[in-house]
């Protein structure tokens, strides 16, 4: 069991090929369009890593299929090309399906990184897709925010759950609502 989770965490490291695959249509090979909100989210990333500005935890909330995950990957590609290659992606639905929580994955992250997250001093980006699938997601992300001060966190999830988060996390996470494209 422990080796399985360690393997999952090791595979969570984002590599260039994965980034390119996630921002393009798999059949047509065309890069997905960027939303206007990308510019604001890009600014959050730049400002945190350049000046230490808040927010450093962003929730992308919206209906299923509106493009939250694609937007997250577009931000990851920007961060990879301009800020840090130290980016980690966790599909929380898959983690939970295998019987693991976000907290368990983060504990294994410490093994992979070679130190506790509360003393980690390099720029790092965490991507959590479908974060609401973990019942303890809000508490876990609050702890991650408080302990890993060099981390920028992007989480996608259900509108209702992200918007109605715990009061502790509400002060830490900036929730951006993602709406369907209009044609």
Region roles according to the model:
Residues 1-183:
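Phosphate-binding site recognition
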